[in-house]
């Protein structure tokens, strides 16, 4: 069983696309879920920590792993080096940090970056060296795990930095800091800022652009499954052509998260049809229970397959670091996204099954929905009561009878018009491109 859980674990595919500090919450989750032996996780944590300045944390884990009170000599020496380097960077950044901590001095700053740089040089003898020192100090603070300090200094650095590459690096650092502090609103703002820069025409090379989009989507997973509006935001980002192409060519594992968002997000239901076409293209080359569930329901109409996949999907969700967030309620622990997913998945199965059959045996339906007979009956009664379903239950024969629905002429007209407007838009675009090509010859 543990092995099958590990087969669904996307950490080996996701971790290389994250800053190493962002991998720690994933390790914490995997350790809590006991997906891997404790010793294996602790060793991986130490390996990761050795590439950061969080030496005290590494020492604690070493003691826990090897059941000792002593830390290795190299860790003790590394700690001395880190403290000395921090002190040195603190001194180099001190003039600018003192200025930023002085409210009266900060009031002299304006929206004009060039004016600020000149004013700092003339009045406070603060030049490029001190600004560079602030960046190095902020970066070092981040490496030490002081995300709050790093976020503040990186923000200030960006207001003074005139180097675009450095400014971009600082923005990535600011995004990581906000994610690690779980400031989801601010993190979303920083994510959108980064997206704007990455999508701009002036952004380095197309290849670099694709790589940055892939990183952005991976980092965004933390925000999308924690922010109140995240399930809509993930669809709006991942479903854009440029981002969807990047997923299909370089990161198909991200389809799990887009598919989950579509299943639990009723507001984006109209876009699901287009996403099903993507699944048709991808589901032979990339296997994931959540993708396969959608293929069973909407591509193959395989309801027995969908029933099996629902059980696998539940396993996937509770063991996924982004989807399996647990909420403690008294003595009970629940996974809200799992419950929401299963409810909507049943609805998908039911709606599609009902389009094919007009009279449905309740026992068969209960089996397809992974419910017992009484649960299925209650579930359907509730759907009818809340007007989500135009049907009635024949208790004597134990069947659900679907009421024939007349096609809504108004809806059909809107759908045809949408299709026409889409084709017209493409046609106009092609004509414009052709005209521009003629003009440049």
From Swiss-Prot:
GO BP annotation list: DNA-templated transcription initiation; flower development; formation of cytoplasmic translation initiation complex; photomorphogenesis; translation
Alphabetically ordered keywords of this record: Cytoplasm, Developmental protein, Initiation factor, Nucleus, Protein biosynthesis, Repressor, Translation regulation
Domain of life assignment: Eukaryota
Signal peptide: none
Pfam families: eIF3_N, PCI
Positions of the PCI domain: 223-407
Disruption phenotype: Several floral development defects, including delayed flowering, reduced sepaloid petals and short stamens. Male gametophytic lethal.
Induction info: Targeted by the COP9 signalosome to proteasome-dependent degradation.
Higher taxonomy: Eukaryota, Viridiplantae, Streptophyta, Embryophyta, Tracheophyta
Subcellular location: Cytoplasm; Nucleus
Annotated function: Component of the eukaryotic translation initiation factor 3 (eIF-3) complex, which is involved in protein synthesis of a specialized repertoire of mRNAs and, together with other initiation factors, stimulates binding of mRNA and methionyl-tRNAi to the 40S ribosome. The eIF-3 complex specifically targets and initiates translation of a subset of mRNAs involved in cell proliferation (Potential). Negatively regulates translation during flower development.
Record-given protein name: Eukaryotic translation initiation factor 3 subunit E
Other information: The PCI domain is protease-resistant.
GO CC terms of this entry: COP9 signalosome; cytoplasm; cytosol; cytosolic proteasome complex; eukaryotic 43S preinitiation complex; eukaryotic 48S preinitiation complex; eukaryotic translation initiation factor 3 complex; eukaryotic translation initiation factor 3 complex, eIF3e
GO MF, one annotated term: translation initiation factor activity
InterPro entries per record: eIF3e, eIF3e_N, PCI_dom, WH_DNA-bd_sf
Organism: Arabidopsis thaliana
Keyword Zinc (UniProt): no
Homology family: Belongs to the eIF-3 subunit E family.
Subunit structure of this chain's protein: Component of the eukaryotic translation initiation factor 3 (eIF-3) complex (Potential). Binds to the translation initiation factors TIF3F1 and TIF3H1. Associates with the CSN (COP9 signalosome) complex. Interacts directly with CSN1, CSN4, CSN6A, CSN6B, CSN7, CSN8 and TIF3C1. Binds to 40S small ribosomal subunit S9 (RPS9B and RPS9C) via its N-terminal part. Interacts with the 26S proteasome subunit RPN12a via its C-terminal part. Also binds with At1g27930 and At4g30620.
UniProt key word NAD: no
